[in-house]
């Protein structure tokens, strides 16, 4: 397993960095030694310009000349993406938000490296925003992972308790999560999205259902009818877990 760790906090020994380090210790305890780490605060990352050049041949990444293309190959190669960031003003700090906005080129990865083959871990700490700030951030990554067909795990810490180094239970949680990847295997993509023009493939109906829900909001009016038809079909199968059927029910009242 190849792991990419992106630490977004400007504090190298802060809560999210400490939790990320503990997670990696757990990962390495089961042989996950192939870890590439970047501290985003030390990189030069310009905001995305929305030019979509990255989505056009030759699909070589981002045209902006900064440090993004240093991280890009490691992101492509990684099986596990770990994002560690504090909550500032009800969402993730700008260092991570800037990077996430630059993730458009990741949509051009070949089938062996595409987003549905990866797993996402989000590690965060928050203080004054409790509970709403962390909820907004977690929901963002639930939506991203759901749409992209990625697995997701979240570790959150309320820093009003003090530094996490003094919280053995939370450190143990991060360590145990790292160890939990001992049996992780890259997903085999077997189910293709039925929506015209999408082209995404997923490991199973579970991931496809979440993709359809996350991509079928009111901002996607032109696609909604086609998506709803596909989701209705999926909602009638017993192959979905209760949690996914609950998510579907937010869009389709009769799908739960």
Positions of predicted regions on the chain:
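N-terminal beta1-alpha1-beta2 submodule of the flavodoxin-like/Rossmannoid cofactor-binding fold
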Residues: 1-84, 90-105, 168, 172-188, ...
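Cofactor-binding loop segments of dinucleotide-utilizing enzymes, especially the Rossmann-like FAD-
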Residues: 8, 40, 124-127, 157
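Short beta-strand elements in bilobed, periplasmic/extracellular small-molecule ligand-binding domains
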Residues: 34-39, 149-158
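Short, glycine-/small-residue-rich phosphate/pyrophosphate-handling segment
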Residues: 94-95, 109-154
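C-terminal recognition-helix end and immediately following basic linker
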Residues: 190-192, 204-234
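The feature encodes the position-specific loop residue within the Cys1-Cys2 segment
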Residues: 195-197
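Intrinsically disordered, low-complexity linkers and flanking regions associated
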Residues: 236-253
